[in-house]
Swiss-Prot record:
Gene symbol of the encoding locus: cmoB
Pfam families: Methyltransf_9
Gene3D superfamilies: Vaccinia Virus protein VP39
EC number from the UniProt entry: 2.5.1.-
HAMAP family in UniProt: tRNA_carboxymethyltr_CmoB
Domain of life: Bacteria
Catalysed reaction equations from the record: carboxy-S-adenosyl-L-methionine + 5-hydroxyuridine(34) in tRNA = 5-carboxymethoxyuridine(34) in tRNA + S-adenosyl-L-homocysteine + H(+)
Its job: Catalyzes carboxymethyl transfer from carboxy-S-adenosyl-L-methionine (Cx-SAM) to 5-hydroxyuridine (ho5U) to form 5-carboxymethoxyuridine (cmo5U) at position 34 in tRNAs.
Name the record gives this protein: tRNA U34 carboxymethyltransferase
Record keywords, A-Z: Transferase, tRNA processing
Length: 332
């Protein structure tokens, strides 16, 4: 587990710079549990593959401001390229991306670049900002945030597979870059004050998995500085269908979907939580071109979760996934 723990050697000074040094003791205790070698039965498969990845030299240059996060050096030999490909494939399924590492294109399930293209034009400039990304997955958007000038990009996601993918990418993209990963939930972050230090807080694709969406929004607000910006992306239902959908069992084959509000209702939630200037900046029905099965994620994907006779409905008969991006400001 050494590479997981080494990730934090440069993180603690960054935390101090962000006026969150008082978090360190609590985070170290939480990480000790999260990074227990027995925490995930797949670690015996991932750890040797991660060692293989880390044995390769870091890349000479990286590109963070285009669709695929790229890292490249002198061309690898075909043998080395195949060795690296197999090591990276040990971390399947790759869900959020895409990435291109030394000529190896990791075609992820999601075109996360498409989401970023929809979100980024509406953001306040990220230049010099401290950014918190809740539910960051493999960390694709953390790199895009740095590409747009963020001073610090901190991702939070309990998935150890996602952290493993992130560490593999960071090895090539740049170990010194200020992007970090905490394999925790939002609820596990320290609540000791001051905690209102982040200029922008993202929560994308998380709210509908929360049993208490209002608590989730309030938790997000806790870490925003006064005047900071919340970016909330979640499933919604068309306004014409009412205010709220509570799926009876599964939604698009997901059994952990609790509340899907209309855009109007979601706006009311944000206002109830004390946010101002609440606006919906994007509304998009997810297509089978944006979320699909690939060589790097060869499990079922969106096409398998929709009604085979009507792609505007899920297999359970609900409206197909419609995602809204809401932006709101925390009062000064």
């Amino acid at each position: 587990m050494k590479h997981y723990h080494q990730h934090y050697s440069s993180f603690w000074p960054k935390l101090e710079e962000a006026r969150l040094g008082h978090w360190q003791n609590a985070l170290e205790a939480a990480l000790e549990t999260a990074l227990d070698p027995d925490a995930n039965g797949n670690l015996p498969k991932w750890l040797p593959a991660l060692e293989t990845v880390m044995a390769f030299p870091s890349s000479d240059s990286a590109e963070l401001s285009q669709s695929a996060i790229k890292a490249h050096s002198q061309p690898f030999s075909e043998d080395d390229k195949e060795k690296l490909t197999q090591a990276l494939k040990a971390f399947m399924p790759w869900r959020k991306g895409p990435f291109e590492i030394e000529g190896i294109y990791i075609d992820t399930e999601w075109h996360s670049d498409w989401k970023w293209d929809r979100v980024s034009p509406h953001l306040s400039s990220l230049k010099g900002r401290k950014v918190l990304d809740i539910g960051c997955g493999s960390g694709y958007h953390l790199w895009r945030m740095l590409g747009d000038g963020a001073e610090l990009a901190l991702g939070v996601d309990p998935g150890l597979l996602f952290m493993t993918q992130f560490l593999a990418i960071k090895h090539f993209v740049g170990e010194s870059l200020p992007a970090y990963f905490l394999p925790l939930t939002l609820e596990q972050l320290p609540k000791t004050q001051p905690s209102e230090v982040f200029d922008t807080v993202f929560s994308m694709g998380v709210l509908y998995h929360r049993r208490s969406p209002i608590d989730h929004i309030m938790d997000l607000k806790r870490y925003l500085k006064p005047g900071g910006e919340l970016v909330l992306e979640t499933l919604v239902i068309p306004d014409a269908q009412g205010q709220l959908l509570v799926p009876k069992e599964r939604y698009a084959q997901m059994n952990n979907v609790w509340f899907i509000p209309s855009v109007q209702e979601l706006g009311h939630w944000l206002e109830k939580c004390g946010f101002k200037n609440v606006r919906c900046v994007d509304l998009d029905q997810t297509s089978v071109k944006e979320q699909r099965t690939t060589e790097w994620m060869n499990w079922n994907s969106l096409a398998d979760f929709l009604d085979p006779n009507d792609s505007n409905k899920t297999i359970e008969g609900y409206s197909a996934p419609l995602r809204a991006v809401m932006i709101a400001d925390k009062p000064c």
